[in-house]
């Protein structure tokens, strides 16, 4: 069973066709590298997978479920797009860490915001937040940054910032992890 299938994915910007019918599948545990010249559409493909850009044509299937079909999903709502994005963890080329937050807070922020939408959040706030913090600490430890969890991005090397970005992406427990220019 493929964890990800992309079928005939196209993306146009006006009359410029950037993605020209991309097809591939990815099995659980596999790694896939896209190699191409600058401007060939690698980042655009990742942005389409994560719905930062809306594909012009094609299908995206995750765990045998169609999450995007250009013919049927012209008007995906914000809630559905957010739900679809949870399948993909993104590590951006420039890492996109929040400079005003520590490494730990960069990792936990999205989960904290999502937790506030839980119906049991008010009654269990401390427990939920403690669990999220513990998971963030464990992920930072797993990428070798336990001692740096209270550092701000400007206090970290580029490689350390990248590892924070990886831990942040893993916090949402995505099905697929995408790296732009690792």
Where do the model's predicted regions map?
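Hydrophobic anchor residue at the start of the ABC signature
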Residues: 166
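Helix-to-loop junction immediately C-terminal to a conserved catalytic motif
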Residues: 50
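Conserved ABC transporter NBD signature motif
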Residues: 58-71, 124
